[in-house]
Amino acid sequence: MCIRDRPKVDPQGKIQSFEALSRWFVGGQAIAPDCFVLMAERHGLMTMFSRLVLQQSVAILQQWQRQGLLYPIAINLGGPELLDDSFFAELMSLSADHPWLTQYLQLEITETNIAVQQPLLHKRLRALNQYGFSISIDDFGTGHSSLSQLVDCPADTIKIDRRFVSCIPQDSRTVRILHTTIQLAKALNLNIVAEGVESDIQRRFLQSLGCQLMQGYLFGRPAPADYWQDQLLPKSPKLELGAKKA
């Protein structure tokens, strides 16, 4: 298993941060993420799996920091990992041993996990936030969270699911939902990320709504950390729209 980083960019194409995505290659062939993640969930391996992602992401951040590159990386976590005592302790140890890392390590948890009425999960999210970790609600709009849970969750970012973005601009009802969601996020002082942006029409429309960050194939495919390091060191971190990287 290895990490491929996907950039999060502002509407002008300037890289602001990254998301760590897991990739698994067997005999030179890529295994679909949906497949191996489902297998890990079925066999109770998600905590071990997420620990590998965490460790590799921390190594990337440390490598970049030595090169003078300070770009946050988000990792995806589920409820089981955060409820695992040893995994939670590892996160807390990171904040104690390397305080600067918490400024550059964002924790993404899906709205479905946030919606679960699990007091210990919410308590641990609040503790992580108090120790400096940024919390992001992933796949926003696809779960079943109430507005009260959104207020109670210590998140500072919401990610609009690609299913909404893919409907821009042809579905007027979805467009109204997007507009309302972005206005709600602004009212709650939350940052906004739209995922699945694949066309300049979508980019410009989201920009007109005030969306702050975007990610998707329009800005480039997920790539190894060394690739982004080479891209970011010699010049200003700005991508050509439509850049591709396998």
Question: How does the language model describe each region?
Answer:
Residues 34, 40-43, 171-175:
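Short, conserved loop/turn and helix-capping segments at secondary-structure boundaries
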Residues 1-39, 76, 137, 220-223, ...:
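Active-site core of bacterial EAL-family cyclic-dinucleotide phosphodiesterase domains
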Residues 27, 78-85, 104-119, 131-246:
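EAL-family c-di-GMP phosphodiesterase catalytic domain
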Residues 124:
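Conserved functional hotspot residues or short segments at active or partner-binding sites
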Residues 10, 14-19, 24, 45-121, ...:
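Catalytic core of bacterial c-di-GMP phosphodiesterases, primarily the EAL and HD-GYP domains
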